[in-house]
Amino acid sequence: MRIIDDIKLDFNDVLIAPKRSQLTSRKEAILTREFKFKHSNHTWAGIPIIASNMDHTGTNAMAHVLMEYHILTALCKFVKSTEWGWNKNIIRTIGLDQNLDNLPYDSDTAPWICLDVANGYTERFNDYVSLMRAHEATKDKIIIAGNVCTPEATEQIILAGADIVKIGIGPGSVCTTRKMTGVGYPQLSATIECADAAHGLGGHIITDGGCTVPGDIAKSFGAGADFVMLGGMLAGHDECAGEVSDD
C-alpha cells in the first residue's frame, strides 16, 4: 500500500482571499462562459452549472426552468421523454449496459451525452468511452464520462475519447460510497489535481458533489473546475420529482 502523506483539502478547509477589483457591484460579474471541446465539434455558451442526473433532480421540470438561465440539466437516465427537440442545454445520461445501436432517445435531440457510473476505474468503462467516440450515434457528441477522482484516471478517460470528465467519488450529500467502501478523495484537492491534468490535454472537468453552499461553487471554479454539478443544493425544490416528507 502506498500512503499519501501530503495534505489534501475539502471545501471546508479553505477560504478565498479577497483582492482588489474594478467591479462596483456583484451584479457586474459575468457568469457565462464559452467552451470549445477537445473531440467534439460543438461549442457551448452559458452558465457552467449542471443539475445532477440524480433520480429526483435531473427532471424535465428542472430542465425547463434552468434553461431559461442558460444552465444545463443532466436528465436522469430513467427519465423517459420525447418532448425535447434539439436543445443545447439538455444532457442525456446512459450507463454501461446501454446498447448504442438502440438509444432510449433520438440521438439528434441533444449535443451532450453522459456516461455515468459509480466507479470509472475499470477497463470496461474506458473501453466504452472509446466505443462511444467511434460509434455513429455518439461520435460527434460532447461526451461526459465519470466518475473518477485522480489525475491519472482523468487523463486516461480524455485520451479514450471523452471531452469532459466528471470528478468526485463519494462527496455528495446522500452518497454512502466513502462510508460503505472507504474509497474517495477530498473534493477540492481532486478538483485542483484533475483540472490540471485535463487542461494539459485540452480537456475539461466537472466537479460533481460536495457543494452545500454557494461559496463551495466559487471555490470549485477557483480550483480549476470548468463546470459544477449540483444535486443536494437543488433537491427539495418544486421541480424535483421526490416525495415531500414533513418531519
Name each model-derived stretch.
Residues 1-204, 232-237, 242:
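Active-site entrance/lid segments in N-terminal catalytic domains of soluble metabolic enzymes
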Residues 204-237, 241-243:
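Active-site capping/gating regions of soluble enzymes
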